[in-house]
């Protein structure tokens, strides 16, 4: 049986720090996150996020990762929580679709598992993510 409680809008706003437009809120248990090894086992394309502190940026990156066919996202502890309200909203739910987990600052394991490092940039010399040289890489 699902328990439900009611509260005055002002009380709910005080609990959450937000004025809830429809007066509904819920609390859920977070799923246990998989290990980095589990996430990367069959992945070919992995995004590693470091020091992304704005929730909207985290959500946008997850949404872009889904559009670009990224297999998994590894989030360093210096980043905003991908499950915070704004990140989830901006991600349009893709944070629940793309496998992700936290990774410590040491990313050497990725190289040991055959991943090559690439960075994304908006500049004249940048190549498309669909570039044949990048596509030929087994793990990126």
Where are these regions (language model features)?
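Post-transcriptional modification and biogenesis factors for structured RNAs
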Residues: 1-140
């Amino acid at each position: 049986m699902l328990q439900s409680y009611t509260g005055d809008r002002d009380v709910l706003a005080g609990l959450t720090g937000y004025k809830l437009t429809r007066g509904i809120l819920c609390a859920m248990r977070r799923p246990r996150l998989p290990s980095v090894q589990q996430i990367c086992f069959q992945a070919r394309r992995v995004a590693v996020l470091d020091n992304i502190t704005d929730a909207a940026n985290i959500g946008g990156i997850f949404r872009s990762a889904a559009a670009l066919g990224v297999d998994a996202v590894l989030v360093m502890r210096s980043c905003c929580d991908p499950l915070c309200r704004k990140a989830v909203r901006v991600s349009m739910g893709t944070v629940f679709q793309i496998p992700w987990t936290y990774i410590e600052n040491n990313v050497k394991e990725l190289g040991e598992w055959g991943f090559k490092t690439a960075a994304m940039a908006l500049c004249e010399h940048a190549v498309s993510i669909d570039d044949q040289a990048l596509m030929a890489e087994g793990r990126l």
